[in-house]
């Protein structure tokens, strides 16, 4: 059953203001912090300005692809509630979680069933699982049926070319949270 939503790739103040002050704001708002290939990438200086806004009920999420020490140090003072991490090992995520004291959304990119099974490696270090496509900046889709049978005691989020005008009923039995780009 869908319990929340995340809008990802926010990069301007007008959009951020609109969604935060909406009658039904998203539970999570994501900012692309270090993946420069994305058209939604936001420089740290701009993040400083955007994140001064009162987030009200929403949680701010730093979206990080294989983050290095440099970016983690640059954003550590920003009011992120979660770090959404792609392409790191469980050990690397554990170190980040301990050092920066952030909740973790472990992002797993999915192409086939082998990719899905990797979620078990991250159970101890993740607060929320995100199953996404391998498309990154291309917002590609993946077969969501691959994750229908997963039963875990942690929230499950799905992404992968989910659009606001999609029939969201299709995702109710799969995920707790949907990530709309």
Give the positions of each predicted feature.
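Conserved N-terminal beta1-alpha1 strand-loop-helix module at the mouth
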Residues: 1-179
């Amino acid at each position: 059953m869908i319990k929340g939503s995340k809008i990802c790739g926010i990069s301007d103040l007008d959009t951020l203001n609109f969604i935060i002050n909406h009658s039904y704001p998203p539970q999570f708002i994501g900012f692309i912090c270090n993946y420069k290939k994305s058209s939604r990438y936001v420089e740290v200086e701009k993040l400083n300005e955007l994140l001064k806004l009162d987030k009200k009920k929403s949680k701010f999420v730093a979206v990080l692809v294989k983050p290095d020490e440099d970016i983690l140090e640059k954003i550590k003072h920003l009011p992120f509630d979660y770090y959404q991490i792609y392409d790191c090992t469980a050990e690397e995520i554990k170190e980040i979680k301990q050092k920066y004291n952030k909740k973790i959304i472990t992002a797993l990119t999915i192409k086939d069933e082998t990719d899905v099974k990797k979620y078990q490696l991250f159970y101890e270090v993740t607060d929320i699982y995100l199953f996404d496509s391998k498309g990154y900046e291309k917002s590609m889709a993946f077969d969501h049926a691959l994750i229908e049978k997963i039963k875990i005691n942690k929230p499950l989020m799905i992404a992968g070319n989910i659009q606001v005008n999609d029939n969201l009923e299709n995702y109710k039995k799969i995920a707790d949270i949907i990530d709309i780009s």
